[in-house]
Amino acid sequence: MTRIRRSPCLLLLIIWFMCIAGSVQVVQSQNQTGATTHPDEARALNSIFAAWKIQAPREWNISGELCSGAAIDASVLDSNPAYNPLIKCDCSFQNSTICRITNIKVYAIDVVGPIPPELWTLTYLTNLNLGQNVLTGSLPPAIGNLTRMQWMTFGINALSGPVPKEIGLLTDLRLLGISSNNFSGSIPDEIGRCTKLQQMYIDSSGLSGRIPLSFANLVQLEQAWIADLEVTDQIPDFIGDWTKLTTLRIIGTGLSGPIPSSFSNLTSLTELRLGDISSGSSSLDFIKDMKSLSVLVLRNNNLTGTIPSTIGEHSSLRQVDLSFNKLHGPIPASLFNLSQLTHLFLGNNTLNGSFPTQKTQSLRNVDVSYNDLSGSLPSWVSLPSLKLNLVANNFTLEGLDNRVLPGLNCLQKNFPCNRGKGIYSDFSINCGGPEKRSVTGALFEREDEDFGPASFFVSAGQRWAASSVGLFAGSSNNIYIATSQSQFVNTLDSELFQSARLSASSVRYYGLGLENGGYTVTLQFAEIQILGSTSTTWKGLGRRRFDIYVQGRLVEKDFDVRRTAGDSTVRAVQRVYKANVSENHLEVHLFWAGKGTCCIPIQGAYGPLISAVSATPDFTPTVANKPPSKGKNRTGTIVGVIVGVGLLSILAGVVMFTIRKRRKRYTDDEELLGMDVKPYIFTYSELKSATQDFDPSNKLGEGGFGPVYKGNLNDGRVVAVKLLSVGSRQGKGQFVAEIVAISSVLHRNLVKLYGCCFEGEHRMLVYEYLPNGSLDQALFGDKTLHLDWSTRYEICLGVARGLVYLHEEASVRIVHRDVKASNILLDSRLVPQISDFGLAKLYDDKKTHISTRVAGTIGYLAPEYAMRGHLTEKTDVYAFGVVALELVSGRPNSDENLEEEKKYLLEWAWNLHEKSRDIELIDDKLTDFNMEEAKRMIGIALLCTQTSHALRPPMSRVVAMLSGDVEIGDVTSKPGYVSDWRFDDTTGSSLSGFQIKDTTGYSMSLVAPGSEISPRDSDFKPMLGSKINEGR
């Protein structure tokens, strides 16, 4: 073969020809039409880019002409990442002399600020992609000008306010993306006019309410994401008419079941994700004809019935998740024979029978934890590279090699290892990281196993264990451990927070073989995957939310690590809970209920995250707290067992005798014994001893119904004993109601009830003792605490969250009626807990109450309650607003020692607001504070204290405003303060019959407690069955 020798001259000649050809192509791109950009659109685009501080690249801005180069080159696609920002033009106007801008892409380049109004003048736009920036402000009604729009996305930004109804004018729209923003208000009905929509992404948008009936018109939809939204009502039946759907996600909403039978029409689906349906049971019948499915996720939906054997006919399935339901019966063998199935999650059901004896080679991840499966395990469980979670079943493990699934014997039903014999008194785990010793000397054991989508682990010595399940949606590289090199500002154990365990669904930690008794459980967190939202990048716009259970009790709902850390990613968060171990077993469960964003900063950035778990005893341990020696002194062991059994028998007899005696003592107290939730019953002698016979030196204060004493129980716990005085007006009925109320609501921002005493004439409540006293003592007392701004803001947020729980989340709805600074207690870490439910009233959703006996404290009373006895949750909202002003100003709601215009805090706050001098309210003692947060708190306080209760926001919206998730609305009316109260001090006085006059001059006389209407008929009557004015 003849070879051609290339000379340098020849190479130069080739290069020259290439350059000429390239130049000709550029000139052609620039001049092939001779058209120019419409001058109005050129000015508009230049203004937009100037406002966003970005420039038009030379590739489509040749010689200053916008519609040139790549902007008119059909070979350059919008999706090409090399061209960003990018516009596209249509130069066919006015005999091909004028170009109109039809496409704009400004994607993921961290543009910060509002959308310039000039954008809405570009009426020839058909494609607008502004996703993954930090755009703020609202979408204006002028969006309706873009009537040619077909593909429009604002996904992953910080846009707020309502979505304008004018979006319904975009009737040619094919794609709408508004996910992962801070919008507020309801989903616009007008979107239903966009009948050509093929893709709709409204997940994590902040919208709420109902899915509009007009959405029944969206029959062209092919993809719909409706997730992480506070929407209500049942899943609409009309979704079954969206028969062109290939992808449907409805996760983490407030929608209730059952799943409509019309869903069986969705036979084109390839991906179906339904999750966290709140009520209503459904079967799996509706999936029968969905033969194109490759992803089927029906997690946490109250599914009942059996798994049909016909599921084996869905040959395209790659992932199946039916976990956290109520399915029963055997597992069909056909499910394990699906040739493309790689991930199978069946955990937390009541499936029974044996494990299928065969599986396909593709199936590498299987979760069947928390079921009733039994029998021997098949041989394939020993295959390498499998991820299996078989925890909490009834498998027979005899003959199983110890190297296969090590520790599974400890994690079968009832967790048998060391059950009935406490050998440990604590445990500490560095979740996702290596062994670390804390500054206090505690050794946090390593937990850096590759859990993957389904796994469990038991520590050496069987002191603790872990179990995790879940597959991150959309992630090609599922990572279950996060790491960081950050140094954390509020802890000496910074290294402990540089790793964290991640889970896409559920992760549990167990303490095994613990000595029975009370424990303090400490959970440590730091958000090391999602950046802080104060960063100037879209990667800081994510929100992670999950639930936390300790010993099966929900202690945190929608817990957000970063928000709790004050929006900081270098601030550690610690949560402390009390737990009782009665069967040598402790469980901490972190569960994702579909809330939070899914894809910021990466696909699959959601679900539980935790840095460390530890538990320490609240009593003096009697065990060695180390693994037992093996094979020594067998005789001693046998003797010990016999003696132990004998002693236990004697002890059991004593306990049974005591219980029977106590029950006999209380047989006449039918109300107490008939309660659904029974707190621990203390004896009078126990509490008398704990308080040193109610020694005056242990007195903490005097409440509305009697004194409160500090006490030390025999198990080492420090408590606050509320002793109801003989003269207290709180009768037996109200006492029982209070016990029921407090026992049924558990939240970190509500004071914890340990138990009660109801013995003869002695009636007492025993609470957790909070060492830092009350908020009014901290702010106004003789020995004030130094509360810096961030602490005050967290206290305000904590109180708001506690009230949200009382009003909207507790199993029984509660209006506190006496929210005030002295009823907000501070724990050792200055976390607020709302106390004193002695004035609380139980009520059903959407009920109200008119009472002639008004209970509360002057200065915190809402006008409609003080003057008319009209009680709703907005009564508490008003009082919260007053507390918020006290936190900002550092002064009580009234102070007779100040000049006239400043005597009454709320009146002074309004006067300053009218003069735009709100910041003068801020406490002079605060030398360093966040001005934006201070203004926010003042604005919220004024919203909460408006005269009309209908104008006050619900507490859930208050939390959203405090958290910065939604903007603060305008205050439209003067605060509802009541002037000319006849009193000397409003900081502690309880209302008890006096004359008041409101700002309109209306005067009335309040009925003193018990003076005209008996408590039995009025005040003590639960508000069940009456009507609430305020709808939710």
Curated annotation (Swiss-Prot):
The keyword Membrane applies. The modification Phosphotyrosine is found at Y767, Y865. It is a single-pass type I membrane protein. ATP binds at L700, G701, E702, G703, G704, F705, G706, P707, V708, K722. Residues 694-968 form the Protein kinase domain. LRR repeats lie at residues 101-122, 123-146, 148-170, 171-194, 196-217, 242-265, 290-314, 315-338, 340-360, 361-385. It comes from the Eukaryota. The chain crosses the membrane at residues 637-657. Its EC number is 2.7.11.1. GO terms for molecular function: ATP binding; protein serine kinase activity; protein serine/threonine kinase activity. It is found in: Cell membrane. It holds the Pfam family LRR_14. GO terms for cellular component: plasma membrane. Glycans are attached at N31, N61, N95, N145, N182, N265, N302, N337, N348, N352, N394, N580, N633. Keywords: ATP-binding, Cell membrane, Glycoprotein, Kinase, Leucine-rich repeat, Membrane, Nucleotide-binding, Phosphoprotein, Receptor, Repeat, Serine/threonine-protein kinase, Signal, Transferase, Transmembrane, Transmembrane helix. The modification Phosphoserine is found at S822, S851. Residues 1008-1032 are annotated as: Disordered. Belongs to the protein kinase superfamily. Ser/Thr protein kinase family. PANTHER family: LEUCINE-RICH REPEAT-CONTAINING PROTEIN DDB_G0281931-RELATED, PROTEIN KINASE DOMAIN-CONTAINING PROTEIN. This is Probable LRR receptor-like serine/threonine-protein kinase At1g56130.
